[in-house]
Amino acid sequence: VPLCATCYYEDYTRCTRCGELLHNDSACYLSDDDDDPYCPDCRDQLLYAEIHSYSYKPRPIFYGDGPRYFGVELEIDNAGEDPDSAGKLLAIGNRGGERIYCKHDGSLDEGFEIVTHPMSLDFHLHEMPWAEILEKAIQMGYLSHKANTCGLHVHISRAAFGANRGEQDFAISRVLYFVEKHWNELLRFSRRTQRQLDRWAARYGYKDDPQEMQEHVKKGYGSRYTCVNLTNDATIEFRIFRGTLKYNTLIATLQMVNRICDAAIFLSDEQLKALSWSEFMAGIREPELIRYLKEQRLYLNEPVESEAEL
């Protein structure tokens, strides 16, 4: 039935996903999104999907004690963007509550990404069944490190860096300074090539002190595809790490990010400028991180034998 313009704009809308014309009374909305209308079919597909669209962002559920929360995005590839496979991983990760979800990622060939809700480091280490999730992904034929398409992205809550935006910005500028100052070591830690980082996690460029770094960033240098993505309102995102299905590597990566945050929050600008890599290493006590640093020949020249990355 043809509609006049007045009726169309006042009483009708279109499904955000498929474009179907809907009367306003028939439009459906997701619980965490009051802006985008859907037809009933598309709403159900999104609500009960094993693999959500790339834009899917549920209301965050926080696990463990804050304010320093870590959100993980782990990309896996090579065995299909298969809802059944995603469902098997969700069944493991979501025992006792929704802790992970899966999303489409256009940068992958035959896979998807596993995303966690925000969790404390302790929760990631002792409550999240990471070892079981990674083992199941391997059993189903997925790769991450070896796929050459995958990243391991770590979000940290902005609230962890200070009580207000100004305090947060100062501490985050020290994160960027640390990353730039120790770029060569972190490049080795990341297991990425410089070419990969130039594409997906580019440098900001080294400055002589953290405050210069902050001014540099304020001028608009940087985008989502930077080593530390600052474009999100509630988090900063480390994008430099290559994907992995190796449990120790994943845990060590979270521990390294945590250590960098410690340095940025608790050291002054002058202390951070004076901090050498060897001095930074000397304070590390976490066994998973120490083992990984030795595997990458970054820890006091003490290499160890290691299992292959997958």
Predicted segment positions?
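Aromatic/basic-lined ligand-recognition segments
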Residues: 71, 169-244
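Short cysteine-rich clusters marking metal-coordination/redox-active sites
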Residues: 4, 15-18, 39-42
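Flexible helix-coil linker/hinge segments at domain or subdomain boundaries
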Residues: 145, 184-198, 262-292, 298
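Terminal catalytic/cofactor-binding subdomain
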Residues: 40-141
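Helical (often loop-to-helix) elements that flank the catalytic cores of nucleotide-handling enzymes
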Residues: 123-134, 160-191, 246-261, 298-306, ...
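Short linker/helix segments within small regulatory modules
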Residues: 1, 26-36
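Short Cys/His-rich "knuckle" micro-motifs
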Residues: 14-16, 25-29, 49-50
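Histidine-centered divalent-metal-coordination microenvironment in nucleic-acid enzymes
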Residues: 111-113, 145-162, 235-239
